[in-house]
Amino acid sequence: MSNPRGNPKYFNPNHLGTQPRAAGGNKGKKMQDQSGQHAQVIQTKGE
C-alpha cells in the first residue's frame, strides 16, 4: 500500500462539501472572504 502522491483522488473523496472552497486548505472564513470588505470585529475585552 503505497501513497499515490501524484493522484490525490484516492485519499481525497470528491463528495459535495468535502473539498475546500475559495481559498483552499483549512484557513477559515477570513481567508475565504472574497468580497473585499473588512471583517466586523467585535471587541469583548480591554480598552
Swiss-Prot record:
Gene induction: Expressed only in the forespore compartment of sporulating cells.
Pfam families reported in the protein's UniProt record: SspN (PF08177)
GO biological process: one example: asexual sporulation
Annotated region described as Disordered, given as residue ranges: 1-47
Compositionally biased spans, kind Polar residues: 33-47
Organism listed in the record: Geobacillus sp. (strain WCH70)
Keywords in alphabetical order: Sporulation
A single GO cellular-component term on record: endospore-forming forespore
Principal location class: other
KW Lipid biosynthesis (keyword) present: no
Family: Belongs to the SspN family.
Protein name: Small, acid-soluble spore protein N
Compartment list: Spore core
InterPro entries hit by this protein: SASP_SspN (IPR012612)
